[in-house]
UniProtKB/Swiss-Prot annotation:
The gene is RPL31B. This is Large ribosomal subunit protein eL31y. One of its GO terms (cellular component) is cytosolic large ribosomal subunit. PROSITE patterns: RIBOSOMAL_L31E. GO terms for molecular function: mRNA binding; structural constituent of ribosome. InterPro entries: Ribosomal_eL31 (IPR000054), Ribosomal_eL31_CS (IPR020052), Ribosomal_eL31_dom_sf (IPR023621). CDD domains: Ribosomal_L31e (cd00463). It comes from Arabidopsis thaliana. GO terms for biological process: translation.
Length: 119
């Protein structure tokens, strides 16, 4: 019998490009920026396998920079799965989503990148 393949429970950091335009296509104007934050949380939860997702203040500011009606079409984010140090925490890991640097040539063709941490 084969072993059950589960998500590896380790600390890891990855960079993703999220296409928010596709996720917010049929959304009302006055709900676009809040829905963008919810979609980023949902994406990080799916990719990292953690229920506890924390969004950085800078990422929140960038989403809301053009108001409630104009979130960016695509955004480059860095998602880090970290160990939860709280004793009364429900889960062992949490995800921290921050904004990543955008290269001068744009977002096309970047793909997913694993970041090596210097600890």
């Amino acid at each position: 019998m084969s072993e059950k393949k589960g998500r590896k429970e380790e600390v890891v950091t990855r960079e993703y490009t999220i296409n928010l335009h596709r996720r917010l296509h049929s959304c009302t104007f006055k709900k676009k920026a809040p829905k963008a934050i919810k979609e980023i949380r949902k994406f990080a939860e799916k990719e990292m396998g953690t229920k506890d997702v924390r969004v950085d203040v800078k990422l929140n500011k960038q989403i809301w920079s053009k108001g409630i009606r104009g979130p960016p079409r695509r955004i480059r984010v860095r998602v880090a799965r970290k160990r939860n140090d709280d004793e009364d925490a429900k889960e062992e890991f949490f995800s921290l989503v921050t904004v990543a640097e955008i290269p001068a040539e744009g977002l096309s063709g970047l793909g997913t990148k694993i970041i090596e941490e210097e600890d």
